[in-house]
A protein has these predicted regions:
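Conserved nucleotide-sugar donor-binding catalytic segment
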Residues: 3-81
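Catalytic core of nucleotide-sugar-dependent glycosyltransferases
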Residues: 55-62, 68-93, 117-136
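GHKL/Bergerat-fold ATPase module in large chromosome/replication-associated machines
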Residues: 88, 103-106
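Residues that mark the junctions of alpha-helical repeat units in TPR/alpha-solenoid scaffolds
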Residues: 96-99, 103, 123
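Residue-level signature for tetratricopeptide repeat
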Residues: 106-113
Length: 140
């Protein structure tokens, strides 16, 4: 399952059959960013992906018009997607545990950034979530 760090699948370098969208849904339009991460989480939790061994695309990042440049705390969107994935009753136990682990990791990163920027209220809210999800992980 591809959940670590950033999305490792680029939509512009992907070939999908239209049935993928029928089976796993489309991009979540309620997300302002990371909607591709959300889709790949849903897909990779149940399907295998195949990567070509050679690099066929050139990725250029960091442009001012990229969504990652427009919004603070991009992990907020990834956290939302991970929480949403946990609600899927068909998620295997191992993928449930992987998702919980990654969710806790991202919550800690966002909490650290919140503390660094003096947003104590958000940090406290995130800490409550961390405690909650750590409890779920320990119950596994």
């Amino acid at each position: 399952m591809c959940i670590r760090d950033r999305c490792c699948i680029s939509p512009s370098s992907t070939i999908l059959h239209y049935s993928v969208f029928k089976d796993y849904g489309k991009f979540d339009e309620s997300l302002k960013a990371c909607e591709d991460y959300d889709l790949w989480l849903r897909y990779c939790a149940f399907e295998k992906t195949h990567f070509l061994g050679e690099q066929l695309t050139i990725k250029n990042g960091g442009h001012s018009d990229q969504l990652s440049q427009l919004y603070w705390g991009m992990d907020r969107f990834r956290i939302y997607s991970l929480e949403k994935l946990l609600q899927n009753k068909n998620l295997s136990r191992s993928n449930y545990q992987l998702t919980l682990t990654e969710l806790i990791r991202k919550l800690k990163i966002l909490m650290g950034g919140s503390i660094k920027r003096g947003n104590i209220e958000l940090a406290e809210e995130l800490n409550k979530k961390i405690i909650h999800f750590q409890g779920l992980l320990e119950d596994e």
